[in-house]
């Protein structure tokens, strides 16, 4: 992989990771269209850690507060958990389904990553679901009103993102809006929910890299990490800023057009 290819792919990863348009789908399609080889374990691990860094930094106050109160609840077992501790518990509940199912079916999912027509189909189908949830959802619930059943539903939704083209942020936003959460609350839970699963995926990638060393350039890795981090942070900030005024329809329209284009190219 050249530095130019690493820059393009990590930029795509950063831009698409937190937008409801599927980062994995865009990476696969870019490689297919440009006939680039798979970037490899090192690239995947460090770009994933880059987007993780971005969301951690953007929500650093929330993350610190959640961690503080989550550990504190064990010293005060006789008192009800603080809202931040409860949110931490809910994020664990929302992470477990994708973590467990992903571990069991990873090899099968990897086999789907080179099927452009599948990506085209999921891109379009789940765009329609996102549009329906945004249109009919009542958008009245706030994040503190989340219960454990709803957190579990967020987790089940996240498991669907194992399929290329679905979009992790897209399907969890769809779930939140369908459960009548406000756009801001659904986005905040979705982005916070990405932290544990991204950390697990990054850790797994680093473990694979450590146990199966391969040739890679630290210059390439550094470029990929920094590019993904900066691009992801800017996208999170812009997405949250314009969420209520822009809504989901631009993303829905983009996904429908992208899916149609992929069918045209790969049919």
Curated annotation (Swiss-Prot):
Compartmental location? Cell inner membrane
Q: Which Pfam families does the protein's record reference? A: BacA (PF02673)
Function as written in the Swiss-Prot or TrEMBL entry: Catalyzes the dephosphorylation of undecaprenyl diphosphate (UPP). Confers resistance to bacitracin.
Q: Which EC number(s) does UniProt give?
A: 3.6.1.27
* Family assignment from sequence similarity: Belongs to the UppP family.
- Major subcellular location class: membrane
Segments crossing the lipid bilayer: 1-21, 39-59, 85-105, 117-137, 189-209, 220-240, 246-266
Q: Which UniProt keywords apply?
A: Antibiotic resistance, Cell inner membrane, Cell membrane, Cell shape, Cell wall biogenesis/degradation, Hydrolase, Membrane, Peptidoglycan synthesis, Transmembrane, Transmembrane helix
Q: Does the keyword Glycoprotein apply?
A: no
- Extra info from the record? Bacitracin is thought to be involved in the inhibition of peptidoglycan synthesis by sequestering undecaprenyl diphosphate, thereby reducing the pool of lipid carrier available.
Q: Name one GO molecular function term.
A: undecaprenyl-diphosphatase activity
Q: What class of enzyme is it?
A: hydrolase
Q: Could you tell me the Gene Ontology terms of the biological process aspect for this record?
A: cell wall organization; peptidoglycan biosynthetic process; regulation of cell shape; response to antibiotic
Protein known as: Undecaprenyl-diphosphatase
Membrane-related topology note: Multi-pass membrane protein
Q: Which InterPro entries match?
A: UppP
Q: Name the domain of life this protein comes from.
A: Bacteria
What is a single cellular component term in the Gene Ontology annotation?
Answer: plasma membrane
Task: Look up and give the organism this protein is from.
Answer: Dichelobacter nodosus (strain VCS1703A)
Q: Which reaction does it catalyse?
A: di-trans,octa-cis-undecaprenyl diphosphate + H2O = di-trans,octa-cis-undecaprenyl phosphate + phosphate + H(+)
């Amino acid at each position: 992989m050249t530095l130019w290819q690493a820059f393009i792919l990590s930029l795509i990863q950063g831009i698409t990771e937190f937008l409801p348009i599927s980062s994995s789908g865009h990476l696969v399609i870019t490689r297919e269209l440009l006939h680039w080889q798979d970037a490899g374990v090192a690239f995947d691990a460090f770009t994933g850690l880059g987007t993780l860094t971005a969301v951690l930094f953007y929500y650093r106050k929330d993350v610190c507060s959640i961690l503080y109160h989550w550990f504190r609840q064990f010293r005060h077992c006789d008192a009800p958990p603080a809202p931040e501790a409860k949110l931490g518990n809910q994020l664990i509940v929302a992470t477990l389904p994708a973590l467990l199912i992903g571990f069991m079916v990873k090899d099968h999912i990897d086999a789907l990553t080179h099927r452009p027509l599948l990506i085209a189909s999921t891109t379009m189908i789940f765009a329609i679901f996102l549009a329906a949830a945004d249109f009919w959802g009542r958008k009245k619930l706030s994040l503190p009103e989340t219960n454990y059943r709803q957190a579990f539903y967020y987790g089940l939704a996240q498991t669907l993102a194992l399929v290329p083209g679905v979009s992790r942020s897209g399907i969890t936003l769809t779930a939140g809006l369908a459960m009548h959460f406000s756009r801001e609350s659904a986005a905040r839970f979705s982005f916070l929910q990405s932290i544990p699963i991204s950390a697990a995926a990054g850790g797994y990638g680093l473990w694979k890299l450590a146990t199966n060393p391969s040739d890679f350039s630290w210059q390439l890795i550094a470029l990929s990490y920094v590019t993904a981090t900066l691009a992801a942070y800017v996208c999170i900030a812009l997405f949250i800023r314009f969420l209520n005024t822009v809504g989901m329809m631009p993303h829905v329209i983009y996904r429908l057009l992208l899916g149609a284009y992929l069918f045209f190219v790969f049919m």
